[in-house]
Amino acid sequence: MKSIKYFSLICFFILCVPFNISAIENDNVLVEARDELKFESVIERAKKSVVILSMNPNVDPETDPSQTGLCSGVVIDEVGHILTNFHCVYNQNYLRLYYYDADDWENYEVNVIGLDPLSDLALIEVIGKEEPMPHLEFAEDAGEIKSGTDVFALGHPMGMAWTVTKGIISSTERYARHPFVKAIQTDSAINKGNSGGPLMNMRGEIVGINALIISRISENAGVGLAIRGDIAKKSVKSM
């Protein structure tokens, strides 16, 4: 009698386990699909806050985006202040902002209103744009971000508008252009033109401002550095 009961239990588990595994697999697929849709939504929102800066009057990103003399910038508040790198705007005789709005490119003159050479950051404002631009927030925990955290970079490398690259935080204790300014190392692809663009967490919050790459060929080699978000936030307040 006992053997019959044991046999029945074994048959029951054999029949149930595949069903449970299948249910778990289906749940995992649904979670992945939901996360992917959420990530896509975050990117679409973030795109509206990332601008192109042209430092070369002979370069028009609308018609010839592959040329040099381009940087990225990110809108950081309701007023429309834009954060970028110091090395993008310093000592430039020409500086113009390109912004994609309502399915068309618009370009504006800008004023440099703050410089922080030590942190390689600069603050600019747009001249003549009346409607506010969407902005991104700094992550509250930007100073506590850990190695291994998923991040993505958004910018205009080589004029390729709104290029998104995904990676992880490789280290939080690097130093960019100054031994006292901490930077984030990431393997998110960063190239020329990404400078000044945001490095973001999966919620679309700024955790860093992309600043430079370490490479022997001046192209992405999996070692990119971004000024840490908490440092950038303090820099903005001081400017």
Residue ranges and their predicted role:
Residues 1-8:
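Bacterial N-terminal signal peptides that target proteins for export
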Residues 8-18:
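Bacterial N-terminal signal peptides
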Residues 23-72, 81-82, 94, 121, ...:
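N-terminal activation segment of mature serine protease catalytic domains
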Residues 27-31, 58-59, 77-155, 159-162, ...:
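Conserved active-site neighborhood of the chymotrypsin/trypsin-like protease fold
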Residues 31-38, 42-45, 65-75, 89, ...:
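Extracytoplasmic/periplasmic, Sec-exported soluble proteins
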Residues 48-53, 73, 80, 84, ...:
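Terminal peptide-recognition signature
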Residues 59-68, 92-95, 133, 154-166, ...:
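Active-site loop architecture of trypsin-fold serine endopeptidases
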